[in-house]
């Protein structure tokens, strides 16, 4: 069993967990998330603490225990506090505007990019060059942030483009004669 899989998950107040065989459902103030666990692992719930249990002694079960624990912990954190990813737009004329379920991006193309946000993910634009993507599903929030960044990823000479706030763009030196 992995080190991550051995550590228990404390369930905060406001989160309800229901285990139905390999299917786990987590409900909280920010929504509901479901996940099917791998057949080699299971979950045991006692006094607001979840622990991962191995169903067999195969090496695969040991490897899956850490994965299952991390996924379930992300679900619990997601429905209670949520996840967010911050993006910044660097470049002249680069703008973003959140309009309901869509995100309008002006990234130097001849046309505006309209990105439709999936269910469960919200976008905010505190300024024209900042985007905050929020949601309860960590994977979905990261996927949306990566797709928005992919429209105009930072170029290596001036650093213009869409980047994560904590991202460091290493700039290349221009060609000398």
From Swiss-Prot:
Pfam family, any one: Ribosomal_L6
SUPFAM superfamilies: Ribosomal protein L6 (SSF56053)
GO annotation, biological process: cytoplasmic translation
UniProt keywords, alphabetically: Ribonucleoprotein, Ribosomal protein, RNA-binding, rRNA-binding
Any GO MF annotation of the entry: rRNA binding
Keyword rRNA-binding: yes
Superkingdom field: Bacteria
InterPro entries reported in the protein's UniProt record: Ribosomal_uL6-like, Ribosomal_uL6-like_a/b-dom_sf, Ribosomal_uL6_a/b-dom, Ribosomal_uL6_bac-type, Ribosomal_uL6_CS
GO cellular component assignments: cytosolic large ribosomal subunit
Keyword Hydrolase: no
Entry function: This protein binds to the 23S rRNA, and is important in its secondary structure. It is located near the subunit interface in the base of the L7/L12 stalk, and near the tRNA binding site of the peptidyltransferase center.
Subunit architecture: Part of the 50S ribosomal subunit.
Family that this chain belongs to: Belongs to the universal ribosomal protein uL6 family.
Protein name: Large ribosomal subunit protein uL6
